[in-house]
């Protein structure tokens, strides 16, 4: 017998809306069980999705999706949404090759009107859709669901300020799962929320505003303040949103459908706006291990449902994130000017390790990358040595601050760029594909990439020693190569690479962790009679010009390999060769970069193979440069 008999009857939200209201809770219960079962098989973001099961069910029951546009901020909580919107039969393909995305994706379903994975974009996108609807004379609803973490970012407030000024008929649902804004909610709060979301209250309030326009200013201002005070006293938490021009409704229990459904129905039928509905939920709701340790179940690998034990593979190599955190701790023990900064990703970047050792010198600024960079710049002006640890994909959000506030002033901010290159299951939205290109064009910037975890230790020490300009150190997600680790980091000579293996026919110049693939390719090429040099550039800027020219002069073929897009390391090498006349027929130069597409999720190994950046692809590129076909030449040499 099925564990989800009612959910089995639902293919789309239209099927859900045919059910009686007293059946909706059973759907939510079954939806939660299906979400738990699916994620236990695939892994993925977990706690946030469990927290919005009732909210997801209620929204699709009340609103006419996809005609009514539903936007999930970040999108990592959208697994229940995907199950209800025609994708249940593929839910166990989440984050695998050819399977469902771990986030909302426009090309995946009409029920995903806006793709997401980075935070705080939903209200801006929703306002754009609402304005487009009004311009076209439509009457559909637009709903943006945003978390209490995401709403802390400046972009969300910019959008709310704009929406309030326009009196747009937009619905924003604040999913507060940290209890960070409001106290626990109760029956009186639910009653008042229902009252304030209703048509009678809104009509009276609008009438009061119109009357106020004809009263003397002093009296009108006092009346408005009294009204705001009374709402704040009774409701709590809404004054800020009211000041931005929103009707504030809440806080309400996001797991109580008896509260959620009537309020959503009232707001759905409203002719004015915008609304902010404050819903309080619990991360991991309905699964005891996740409720007890929400941080450990934010994102999970495959796990045992009965115990909650996650099936993490053992490794002999440390993760790059841990190596960075531990290296920074060692450096900070010798230098009290070192501080660590993260934008809401302490465990993802290794800053949590630093925080345990130096809590007073650790700053988590929240989802505020722009602020993080300029905050670091301010610290640098006062002689401190800020390490701003941030994912490559999120540093994009603070590019003007990097340019204007850091590079232009040559301030020694140290950027520790995590998740450089392809990241696997999180796919294109989280790939660190572009930082080589967008940082490499900036004056005053030192840019280096670790080829393994031991090099990372030395590069952290190198950044500590750079006090006259900004520096960027990039390294990938995941585990290192298992190399021998140094006891302490030793600063490297700026702008100097190293030769790993000497040959005379082919030169492979790597920037980053593709070095291991270069070494594999060199072995295969040597077996085929092609003597191959392997070099580790270490620095993209300043580039080791002497090394580049030496490789070009002493080899027939020079190939660069990097985990980044066009416009990065290979482009800089080509520019150098062109300036020295080395591309005038003297050397066959090829730059291996990520393809000019957004690569979908898969394992990192498969993604790099598909991108043409593994050892096999390197060997193939060498034969292409020679003007020979690899398979035929292999047979000939054999």
Curated annotation (Swiss-Prot):
Keywords: Isoprene biosynthesis, Magnesium, Metal-binding, Thiamine biosynthesis, Thiamine pyrophosphate, Transferase. Thiamine diphosphate binds at residues 76, 117-119, 149-150, 177, 287, 369. SUPFAM superfamilies: Thiamin diphosphate-binding fold (THDP-binding), TK C-terminal domain-like. Binds 1 Mg(2+) ion per subunit. Binds 1 thiamine pyrophosphate per subunit. It comes from the Bacteria. Disulfide bonds: none annotated. One of its GO terms (biological process) is thiamine biosynthetic process. Mg(2+) binds at residues 148, 177. One of its GO terms (molecular function) is magnesium ion binding. It catalyses: D-glyceraldehyde 3-phosphate + pyruvate + H(+) = 1-deoxy-D-xylulose 5-phosphate + CO2. Pathway: Metabolic intermediate biosynthesis; 1-deoxy-D-xylulose 5-phosphate biosynthesis; 1-deoxy-D-xylulose 5-phosphate from D-glyceraldehyde 3-phosphate and pyruvate: step 1/1. Its EC number is 2.2.1.7. Its cofactor is Mg(2+); thiamine diphosphate. InterPro entries: Dxylulose-5-P_synthase, THDP-binding, Transketo_C/PFOR_II, Transketolase-like_Pyr-bd, Transketolase_BS, Transketolase_C, Transketolase_CS. Catalyzes the acyloin condensation reaction between C atoms 2 and 3 of pyruvate and glyceraldehyde 3-phosphate to yield 1-deoxy-D-xylulose-5-phosphate (DXP). Homodimer. Belongs to the transketolase family. DXPS subfamily. This is 1-deoxy-D-xylulose-5-phosphate synthase.
């Amino acid at each position: 017998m099925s564990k989800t008999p009612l959910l089995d009857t639902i293919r789309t939200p239209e099927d859900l809306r045919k059910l009686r209201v007293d059946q909706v809770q059973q759907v939510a219960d079954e939806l939660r069980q299906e979400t738990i079962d699916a994620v236990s098989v695939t892994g993925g973001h977990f706690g946030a999705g469990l927290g919005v099961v009732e909210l997801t069910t209620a929204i699709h029951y009340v609103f006419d999706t996809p005609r009514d546009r539903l936007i999930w901020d970040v999108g990592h909580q959208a697994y229940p949404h995907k199950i209800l919107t025609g994708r249940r039969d593929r839910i166990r393909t989440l984050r695998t090759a050819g399977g469902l995305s771990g986030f909302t994706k426009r090309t995946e379903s009409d029920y995903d009107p806006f793709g997401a994975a980075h935070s705080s974009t939903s209200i801006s996108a929703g306002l754009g859709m609402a304005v487009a609807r009004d311009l076209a004379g439509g009457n559909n609803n637009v709903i943006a669901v945003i978390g209490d973490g995401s709403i802390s970012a400046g972009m969300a407030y910019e959008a709310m300020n704009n929406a309030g000024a326009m009196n747009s008929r937009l619905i924003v649902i604040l999913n507060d799962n940290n209890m960070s804004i409001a106290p626990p909610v109760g029956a009186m709060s639910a009653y008042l929320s229902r009252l304030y979301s209703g048509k009678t209250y809104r009509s009276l309030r609008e009438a009061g505003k119109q009357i106020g326009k004809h009263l003397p200013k002093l009296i009108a201002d006092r009346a408005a303040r009294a009204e705001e005070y009374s709402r704040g006293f009774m409701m709590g938490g809404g004054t800020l949103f009211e000041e931005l021009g929103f009707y504030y409704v809440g806080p309400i229990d996001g797991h109580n459908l008896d509260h959620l459904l009537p309020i959503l129905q009232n707001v759905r039928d409203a002719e004015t706006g915008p609304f902010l509905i404050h819903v309080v939920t619990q991360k991991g709701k309905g699964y005891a291990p996740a409720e007890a340790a929400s941080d450990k179940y934010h994102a999970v690998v495959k796990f045992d449902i009965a115990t909650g034990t996650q099936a993490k593979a053992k490794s002999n190599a440390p993760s790059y994130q841990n190596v960075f955190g531990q290296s920074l701790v060692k450096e900070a023990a010798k230098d009290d000017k070192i501080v660590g900064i993260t934008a809401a990703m302490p465990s993802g970047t290794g800053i949590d390790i630093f925080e345990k050792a130096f809590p007073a010198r650790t700053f988590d600024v929240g989802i505020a990358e722009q602020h993080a960079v300029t905050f670091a710049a301010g610290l640098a002006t006062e002689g401190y040595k800020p390490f701003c640890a941030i994912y490559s994909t999120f540093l994009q959000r603070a590019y003007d601050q990097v340019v204007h506030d850091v590079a232009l002033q040559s301030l020694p901010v140290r950027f520790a760029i995590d998740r450089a290159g392809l990241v696997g299951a999180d796919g294109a939205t989280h790939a660190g594909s572009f930082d080589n290109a967008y940082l490499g064009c900036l004056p005053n910037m030192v840019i280096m990439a670790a080829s393994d975890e031991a090099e990372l230790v030395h590069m952290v020490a190198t950044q500590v020693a750079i006090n006259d300009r900004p520096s960027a150190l990039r390294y990938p997600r995941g585990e290192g190569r298992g190399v021998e680790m140094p006891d302490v980091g030793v600063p490297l000579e700026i702008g100097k690479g190293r030769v790993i293996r000497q040959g005379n026919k082919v030169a492979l110049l790597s920037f980053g962790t593709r070095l291991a693939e270069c070494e594999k390719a060199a072995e295969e090429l040597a077996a085929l009679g092609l003597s191959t040099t392997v070099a580790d550039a270490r620095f993209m800027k300043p580039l080791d010009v002497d090394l580049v020219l030496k490789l070009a002069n002493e080899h027939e073929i020079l190939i660069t390999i990097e985990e980044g897009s066009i416009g990065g390391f290979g482009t800089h090498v080509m520019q150098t060769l062109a300036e020295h006349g080395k591309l005038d027929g003297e050397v066959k130069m090829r730059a291996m970069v990520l393809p000019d597409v957004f690569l979908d999720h898969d394992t990192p190994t498969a993604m790099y193979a598909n991108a043409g950046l593994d050892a096999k692809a390197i060997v193939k590129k060498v034969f292409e440069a020679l003007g020979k076909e690899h398979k035929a030449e292999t047979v000939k040499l054999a």
